[in-house]
């Protein structure tokens, strides 16, 4: 597994794929820095006027609805339509789906066109008939609560999509293959934008790995291992954020091996 991660990182740093981000304003800076630390080239666009050209240049399109308004919704819908026409993978983070009616409606609209969907348990549950508990952007459900919905979502997808339910443990599926990841550190949940940045990492990995399930699995594991290494170096969230970027960049697989082989 670590060898596959290493190969993916090498490809990212050799190819430096462009990833177009239609994302929220809260985590935009941290997200862009995560892409750069990996070796990818992020574009953080807020203009409809350049969408078609930028999608043509991009290897993947990442959409996150964390700070949506009517202009953002129009831009996201158009980006999805253009990405589908140009056969570009759409990586989707349904931030807050289930918390409000509009977020849930927008998420359902984008869902059917997504190549990878990454959300917490409550967000993924909002796509099924099971009542979800939310605390704004945070989940009040455990990962195992959303596994059946995740499998059903991935199974219904016609384009080989993958679904990741993330939390204290992570579950990844494409409807046929399943993986559970029990890595990471609780301090990661104390920093805004970590989930958004995880989805961005998945977009970067999908830019160089055609198989959506493998891209998602490797991306989740790499992100989680970097969190564990960053936690070794600090006690609180302020320094953790800086050390986490350092670990994304360092790709220290020798240190990762201690956790990955447990």
Swiss-Prot record:
Documented EC number(s): 2.7.1.50
Positions bound to substrate: 44, 193
Highest rank taxon of the organism: Bacteria
MF GO annotations: ATP binding; hydroxyethylthiazole kinase activity; magnesium ion binding
Binding site for ATP: 118, 166
Cofactor(s) required, per the database record: Mg(2+)
Keywords tagged on the record: ATP-binding, Kinase, Magnesium, Metal-binding, Nucleotide-binding, Thiamine biosynthesis, Transferase
The reaction(s) this protein catalyses: 5-(2-hydroxyethyl)-4-methylthiazole + ATP = 4-methyl-5-(2-phosphooxyethyl)-thiazole + ADP + H(+)
TM region positions: none
Record keyword Kinase present: yes
Pathway: Cofactor biosynthesis; thiamine diphosphate biosynthesis; 4-methyl-5-(2-phosphoethyl)-thiazole from 5-(2-hydroxyethyl)-4-methylthiazole: step 1/1
Major enzyme class: transferase
NCBIfam families: PRK09355.1
Function (record text): Catalyzes the phosphorylation of the hydroxyl group of 4-methyl-5-beta-hydroxyethylthiazole (THZ).
Protein family (similarity comment): Belongs to the Thz kinase family.
Protein name: Hydroxyethylthiazole kinase
Classification lineage: Bacteria, Pseudomonadati, Chlamydiota, Chlamydiia, Chlamydiales
């Amino acid at each position: 597994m670590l060898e596959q991660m290493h190969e993916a990182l090498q490809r990212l740093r050799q190819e430096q794929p462009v990833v177009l981000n239609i994302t929220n304003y809260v985590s935009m800076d941290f997200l862009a820095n995560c892409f750069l630390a990996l070796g990818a080239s992020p574009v953080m666009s807020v203009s409809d006027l350049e969408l078609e050209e930028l999608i043509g240049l991009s290897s993947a399109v990442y959409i996150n609805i964390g700070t949506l308004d009517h202009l953002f919704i129009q831009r996201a819908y158009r980006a999805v339509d253009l990405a589908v026409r140009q056969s570009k993978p759409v990586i989707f983070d349904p931030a807050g789906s289930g918390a409000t009616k509009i977020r849930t409606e927008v998420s359902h609209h984008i869902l059917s066109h997504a190549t990878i969907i990454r959300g917490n348990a409550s967000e993924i549950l909002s796509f099924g008939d099971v009542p979800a508990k939310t605390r704004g952007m945070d989940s009040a459900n455990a990962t195992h609560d959303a596994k059946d919905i995740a499998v059903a979502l991935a199974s219904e997808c016609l384009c080989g999509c993958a679904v990741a339910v993330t939390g204290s443990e992570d579950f990844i599926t494409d409807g046929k293959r399943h993986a559970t990841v029990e890595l990471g550190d609780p301090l990661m949940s104390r920093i805004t934008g970590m989930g958004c940045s995880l989805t961005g990492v998945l977009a970067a990995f999908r830019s160089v790995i055609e198989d959506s399930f493998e891209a998602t699995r490797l991306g989740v594991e790499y992100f989680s291992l970097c969190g564990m290494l960053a936690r070794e170096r600090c006690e609180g969230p302020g320094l953790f954020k800086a050390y986490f970027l350092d670990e994304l960049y360092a790709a220290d697989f020798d240190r990762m091996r201690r956790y990955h082989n447990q």
